[in-house]
Amino acid sequence: MNRISRYYFHRSVLSLLIAAMIYAPPGMTAFTSNVIGVVNDETVDGSQRVDERGATNNAHIINHGNQEVYGGISNGSVIDTGGHQEVSGHGSYQGQANNTVINGGSQTISEGGISTGTIINDKGTMSVLTNAKADATRIDNGGAMDVAGNATNTIINGGTQNIYNHGIATGTNINSGTQNIKSGGKADTTNISSGSKQVVEKGGTATGSNIRAGGTLIVDTGGIAHGVYLDTGSALVANTGAGTDIDGYQRSSHFTITGGRAEHVVLENTGQLTVVAQTSAVDTIVDAGGKLIVHEEAVAYTTRLNNGGILDVREKGSATGIQQSSQGALVATTRATRVTGTRADGVAFSIEQGAANNILLTNGGVLTVESDTTSAKTQVNAGGREIVKTKATATGTTLTGGEQIVEGVANETTINDGGIQTVSANGEAIKTTINEGGTLTVNDNGKATDIVQNSGAALQTSTANGIEISGTHQYGTFSIASNLATNMLLENGGNLLVLAGTEARDSTVDKGGAMQNLGQDSATKVNSGGQYTLGRSKDEFQALARAEDLQVAGGTAIVYAGTLADASVSGATGSLSLMTPRDNVTPVKLEGAIRITDSATFTIGNGVDTTLADLTAASRGSVWLNSNNSCAGTSNCEYRVNSLLLNDGDVYLSAPATTNGIYNTLTTSELSGSGNFYL
């Protein structure tokens, strides 16, 4: 018997008296335990039973509360955390729950029960069991609904609906959130909006799903989805595994995935098709955000790889007839069985029998050249990467914004603007050409020989054990061998780290270049825009570091520790600074002839040992005595040099930032020439 009115009952005086018998044990709220009439606005924190003669309005079911609607009616109940409501039929009467709000509590609709208009809020749960019904349920963020019965017209706003065996959901609208269709569960006419998804698990069935732009349909192996419609900008995630059965329309074209064969599938916006062993995909379109994965013993025929799409061909997988756009990403290995296609520039490419030819890598594309295989004429653009494994060989690779990682051998690589070739331990690069804006990085135990370093190219390396480098640049030949670097050119991002116990000679640091010396260097030239440091790297200070004949011609040089012997600083942007020693075990020493000219600046920190230095400041070159806060106590900050020659030069004895009456003092055994002292 179906009743919709809460005022249905005609009750005797006796029944009214019974309905009014209320018992409340100590500590509990008074409520009607057995409802056979109509009760309003009760708070239930114990057990309440509503049979076919009863109805409740606006019940509040709180922690430990349990309302059993056993053939009766519940209108407007609110179920808080720890509260529970169970709705079931009794005999020929259906139990009804209307407009329930679940705030962290739970509601179970059992056989013969009906719910209408339930709202499930955060941490609230609703279970619709076999032969039970739920209509117009709303599942908000954090709420969950489990369906083994019948659910119609559900709205999902950030929550989750799970459809189990024998469960049927019809007319669901997923505005955000998820609908999971388990084995034996069915969903019909589901609308999936942006940011939401429908998941069809093995043995589950979806019919007539409509996936809007930004929405996602996920079909697991063995899942069934018939009559689906995917808008432009929606995502299909599926595979060709056993039992998978999908058909529908994308962009007004029919597609299918059935019997281990996918035809005319469009992948975009996180969509993904996985082609498993012994199956195939035909005429796939991979658009921006889409991905096609081809596994071992699987085949993809006539794939169109558009800008922003990814085609991933795994070991022993095959993909033939590829049409690759200029920004389509191919991810492949030279152990693929067969990969063929045409690039956007009309060049044919292939991977067969362990040899890759003319591969274009861009925008996330990766070619892995495996051991005992080869690649030739690979084009690596921005976002692309070629990985040359141990015992593999790559020949004629061109890097234009992309990267090549060399663990094996790379021959005749050309590095253009934005390109990077990294030679790893035991890797070898032969006849690499580095053009302006390109970078060659050689790591410990790496080898790079016959390099051509053109103007504006960057070389990044160190004097570490095992590094072997040779080549030519605008200043002649250069090399690193046996921990000795000779005639290196560092510019435009290039850098050299001279490790403790190693040496560099005749290095040139140009604009954008950098050199750090923890060992020894001689005749280093630091030009405008170049940076040089002695005695410090990002990891350590080195007291035994030493530099001789340092030439700072418009660049910047800083001595943190060690000894500088003989130096010149020139040009208005030229700057040489000797920092206050960090501690007693990392002293800073200056000795020999130091010449500051042409408006250059030379700064000496307090505590630097300059007693063996002969200073010349000429042509408005300036010497600054910079004590900072290092001169404490009551004594003056003392500076000593062996000799000081001024030829229109300047000396600044800036006041220490300490107690009044403390001064910088400069003592020299010989003072000559003409210039200015500023106190």
Task: Annotate each predicted stretch with a short phrase.
Residues 1-679:
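Long, low-complexity, polar and repeat-rich extracellular regions
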